Amino acid sequence: STVVGKCCKGNFGMSRFLLSNDFQRKLIVSGKESYYDHFSKRSYSSPSKAPGTESTITSTKIKMPNIGSEGFAFSSFLSTVNKNSRMINFSSCLKTPVKPEQIAANPVILKMTTELEKIPRALRWMCGGFPAIALCDAPEPWQLGFQDAATPIMQGIMDLHHDIFFFLVQILVFVLWVLSRALWCFRSKISPIPQRIVHGTTIEILWTILPSIILMFIAIPSFTLLYSMDDVVVDPAITIKAIGHQWYWSYEYSDYNNSDEQSLAFDSYMVPEDDLELGQLRLLEVDNRVVVPAKTHLRVLITSADVLHSWAVPSLGVKCDAVPGRLNQISTFIQREGVYYGQCSEICGTNHAFMPIVVEAVSTKDYGSWVSNQIQ
């Protein structure tokens, strides 16, 4: 509890970054920075450049014990407790320069990695990898929980999940208690002759009424959420049409289509792994993102040009089927700026897994500039 309490006051950027897919690739850094790639067992550093600029990554010679990504993340995660070792939040590395010794030569990490190397990998995941991932605020490998909610709908889904989980835990505890008591009280040593019960009015009434009451408590809170999910904004600020293809997405901003010569439409393909640039995620990055303004009511019209697809973005709490010959629509309200990733969620053929969706929410000013550049 002491470790968790102190770590909650610290930051989890270290663990999140070390477990992210793009950790083994590249990183935007400022000044003479360095980070350790545990997947390739190498440390990387960049030449000095102005803050916020991309830099070419070169290899240096710093080695660490072979403890696996989850062990290294756990050691880094716990090292935030040490006040003398000033660990860095990689999500804000542009503001706080990263020093090589803070990552690879940190005595706390070296000591922990030496000890963690002796622990079985499964135990390292259970004690370190999973807790570190559970506290992340971005999609991660082996993620156990939800992504951060960026819309009221997603927040409502998470709240409903927690409410239902409360009842599920109580049911689980009750069933385990009844099962354990039955196994213990009616074991062969105590009751060598089994009792035969063929009818019980009381228990039949109980197991009919109680589940009905529980289902009511679970269903009633979901009514408001279901209604809000189907609610369509009467006058949305922006309307976007998403068209599914095998195997890419097309987008049309109908509000700016004044003529055939002036329109805002583009195709969005997945970026191949060999073409990924600084900070881009494998199998999730696209060449053309859907750019929308934050804190604005949006409407997305979804259809398909060939087979069934599904337009889904977990952080936004949206998932809508793209059906050929049919136009479905969803409404959303993104509460903060950010980049949100999704994928086609309906099996649509060979390259179904290579149809990512990237929604970038920006400020109204930046959105206006983007639209102007696209139309020109």
From Swiss-Prot:
It is an enzyme of class 7 (translocase). PROSITE patterns: COX2, COX2_CUA, COX2_TM. Residues 185-204 are mitochondrial matrix. Gene3D superfamilies: 1.10.287.90, Cupredoxins - blue copper proteins. It is found in: Mitochondrion inner membrane. The keyword Mitochondrion applies. Residues 226-376 are mitochondrial intermembrane. InterPro entries: CcO_II, CcO_II-like_C, CcO_II_C, Copper_CuA, Cupredoxin, Cyt_c_oxidase_su2, Cyt_c_oxidase_su2_TM_dom, Cyt_c_oxidase_su2_TM_sf. Signal peptide: none annotated. Its main location: mitochondrion. GO terms for molecular function: copper ion binding; cytochrome-c oxidase activity. Belongs to the cytochrome c oxidase subunit 2 family. This is Cytochrome c oxidase subunit 2, mitochondrial. The gene is COX2.
